């Protein structure tokens, strides 16, 4: 993991906008790790990303109880994975979650529970409370495969 950046998002709308922006950057084989405490907005960010990539306001339930929700889209299978209830990384192997396929993108909530199995070349978004009740601070840590894709300040590529 190499590049680090920090963003301040003033409200839920900005969190969703970040998800929509990231949707256009995804490639097959990507892993996006969403970290942060309960209720911080990980699922909202993932939901906005999935809907933007789908190009429609599809239903995107939280995968808290199913562990995995699959979204087969035109060019990618997005797997929204919630590891909150996973106690041992070996459980992921039992679920068939070892390595994303070349046409898959994994969005993982609570990735800390599978740290040894995660690829080094991933995008991590750590969400934390901001200075106002609805604000969030997002810490991005990007692996080498993400460096050329992430916008720099003032860059409007996405």
Per-region residue spans from a language model:
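N-terminal pre-Walker A segment at the start of P-loop NTPase domains
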Residues: 2-21
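Conserved nucleotide-sensing/catalytic segment adjacent to the nucleotide-binding pocket
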Residues: 59-60, 64, 68-110
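Hydrophobic anchor at the beta1->P-loop junction of P-loop NTPases
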Residues: 32-34
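Phosphate-binding P-loop
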Residues: 24-29
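Conserved lysine of the Walker
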Residues: 42
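Short phosphate-coordinating micro-motif centered on Lys-Gly-acidic
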Residues: 5, 88-158
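P-loop (Walker A) phosphate-binding loop of NTP-binding proteins
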Residues: 37
């Amino acid at each position: 993991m190499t590049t680090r950046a920090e963003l301040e998002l003033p409200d839920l709308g900005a969190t969703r906008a970040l998800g929509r922006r990231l949707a256009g950057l995804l490639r097959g084989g990507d892993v996006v790790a969403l970290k942060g405490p309960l209720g911080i907005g990980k699922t909202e960010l993932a939901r906005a990303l999935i809907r933007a990539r789908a190009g429609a306001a599809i239903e995107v339930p939280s995968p808290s109880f199913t562990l995995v929700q699959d979204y087969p889209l035109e060019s990618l299978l997005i797997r929204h994975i919630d590891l909150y209830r996973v106690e041992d990384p070996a459980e992921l192997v039992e679920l068939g979650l070892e390595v994303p396929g070349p046409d898959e993108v994994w969005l993982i909530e609570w990735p800390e529970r599978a740290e040894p199995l995660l690829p080094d070349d991933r995008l991590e978004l750590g969400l934390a409370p901001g200075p106002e009740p609805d604000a969030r601070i997002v810490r991005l840590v990007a692996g080498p495969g993400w460096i050329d894709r992430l916008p720099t300040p003032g860059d409007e590529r996405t």
